[in-house]
A protein has these predicted regions:
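A structural detector for beta-sheet-dominated domains
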Residues: 25-27, 170-172, 251
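C-terminal structured domains
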Residues: 182-256
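Hydrophobic residues embedded in beta-strands of well-ordered beta-sheets
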Residues: 23, 175-178, 222
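Hydrophobic alpha-helical segments and helix pairs
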Residues: 69-125
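A contiguous, surface-oriented mixed alpha/beta subdomain in the mid-to-C-terminal portion of proteins
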Residues: 101-207
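An N-terminal, globular interaction/scaffold subdomain
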Residues: 1-74
Length: 256
């Protein structure tokens, strides 16, 4: 509060055994400006100091069945999500606190007990945190299931011999094309190697059949041709790289 550039604002503080007391005494004419500054600063303080403790508390209380390492992963996902400026929940955190503080002051209160206010007067803000945390837990579970499935497929591939020497994938996001070792188009929907057992496990829209074919063909080498570099970090391609590992070769500049 000492950085506030307001005339006739007097600040004092006292430290007691279990808490610190900050007193703001404003004798200026623009009380609304003072309230704005006050709510702004305290809202930022709540996000900086209270929020990390609240999230850990809720994680230990409501998701106690995760071990320490798993909780740390969830917290990492949560911290990363706070950087997402397109998430309306993330953006609404500050506003929810600010409005609660302003309403509290307008009710005629002249003091704010920090812990009590955070625990009992921030229902909207705490609901946002609960929703964010639940979303992050769900994302963690999906990522864990995804990695477990990838590991199963890697084990399956490593324990079976290749049925094809080389397969080319011309990746177009939709309507991608598979070519055999002679660079002839593979009709995957009518191939003898098509086996629907993998289609129910993982879905990538139009790439379902391609993934299914590759998991049955088990090529010794998978050459992926990417005509558009923006596809390089595509989820489906990342999955293929994880599954087939050193069998994958990426081509970005050939004419096929």
């Amino acid at each position: 509060f000492s950085a506030l550039n307001l005339e006739k604002l007097y600040i004092s503080s006292n430290s007691f055994k279990i808490y610190d007391n900050v007193i703001l005494h404003y004798n200026g004419n623009d009380i609304n400006l003072f309230y704005n500054y006050f709510c702004n600063i305290l809202s930022k303080a709540i996000i900086k100091f209270y929020e990390p403790l609240k999230i850990k508390q809720e994680l230990n209380k409501n998701f106690f069945y995760f071990n320490h390492f798993e909780k740390e992963q969830i917290l990492e996902i949560f911290d990363n999500e706070l950087e997402n400026q397109t998430n309306s929940l993330v953006l609404n955190r500050f506003t929810a606190i600010y409005k609660s503080l302003l309403n509290y002051i307008n009710e005629g209160h002249h003091s704010v007990i920090f812990n009590g206010f955070c625990n009992f007067r921030l229902s909207s803000y705490n609901a946002i945190l609960d929703c964010l945390l639940s979303n992050c837990v769900n994302r963690f579970l999906l990522e864990r299931e995804y990695l477990e499935f990838i590991n199963l497929l890697k084990l399956y591939i490593s324990s079976n011999s290749p049925k094809e020497s080389t397969i080319h994938l011309i990746y177009l996001k939709t309507n991608s094309i598979l070519l055999d070792d002679n660079k002839q188009i593979i009709d995957i929907k009518h191939s003898d190697l098509l086996n629907a057992k993998f289609l129910s496990d993982i879905t990538f829209s139009d790439n379902d059949y391609i993934l299914n074919y590759l998991l049955n063909a088990l090529p010794a080498q998978l050459i992926i041709h990417i005509p558009n570099l923006s596809y390089f970090q595509d989820e489906f391609l990342n999955t293929l790289r994880l599954i087939f590992e050193n069998r994958v070769c990426i081509c970005t500049d050939c004419v096929i």
